[in-house]
Amino acid sequence: MVATQNKNLKPNRKHQILESLALMLQNCPGQRITTAKLAAEVGFSEAALYRHFPSKARMFEGLIDFIEESIFSRINLILADHKEALVRCHHILHVLVVFAERNPGMCRILAGDALMGENERLRGRVHQFFEKLESQFKQVLRERKLREGKTFTINEAALASLLVSFAEGKISQYVRSGYSKKPSTDFNEQWQFLMANK
């Protein structure tokens, strides 16, 4: 019974550490988060942090895993629920915007701001996230011709890149403004403008 309880405690502690890290990223814009500061925030010793995560990089990877799971699980639901390419793209962008707005600390990771001076592989993980997102947009856009018999005035790869750049811009603007410029601001009007010359 004790072993079971200890097993149950570990994920909770891990979750607590990741939540605290995300909150510190949100509340300390522009600042580097040290393990000493994180340990003080969580109420553990630094040694206790390292019992749950072998390095600070693994803590950041835990947050990146959360971002990927949150976004791509929602994208899978969108693909199952909607068949029109532009409706899918609109919903995917909206998921990104809403996620960003609800998780300001995570935006610092996606914008790269929180990763300055951290392990280089973390930047690689964020790069992979946006590459995967762009590939998803490309697939959706290319299927439009097959599903709907329609094409675009711009090639699908260029449009997919534009949509990802739009999302990245929204996230970066949110971080740069100290979270005052919400990603959802003018989103629908901007989407309509983007699609005006589709």
UniProtKB/Swiss-Prot annotation:
Keywords: Cell cycle, Cell division, Cytoplasm, DNA-binding. InterPro entries: Homeodomain-like_sf, HTH-type_Tx_Regulator, HTH_TetR, NO_SlmA, SlmA-like_C, Tet_transcr_reg_TetR-rel_C_sf. Residues 34-53 bind DNA. It is found in: Cytoplasm, Nucleoid. Residues 11-71 form the HTH tetR-type domain. One of its GO terms (biological process) is cell division. Its main location: cytoplasm. GO terms for cellular component: bacterial nucleoid; cytoplasm. One of its GO terms (molecular function) is sequence-specific DNA binding. Pfam families: SlmA-like_C, TetR_N. NCBIfam families: PRK09480.1. Required for nucleoid occlusion (NO) phenomenon, which prevents Z-ring formation and cell division over the nucleoid. Acts as a DNA-associated cell division inhibitor that binds simultaneously chromosomal DNA and FtsZ, and disrupts the assembly of FtsZ polymers. SlmA-DNA-binding sequences (SBS) are dispersed on non-Ter regions of the chromosome, preventing FtsZ polymerization at these regions. Belongs to the nucleoid occlusion factor SlmA family. Homodimer. Interacts with FtsZ. This is Nucleoid occlusion factor SlmA. The gene is slmA.
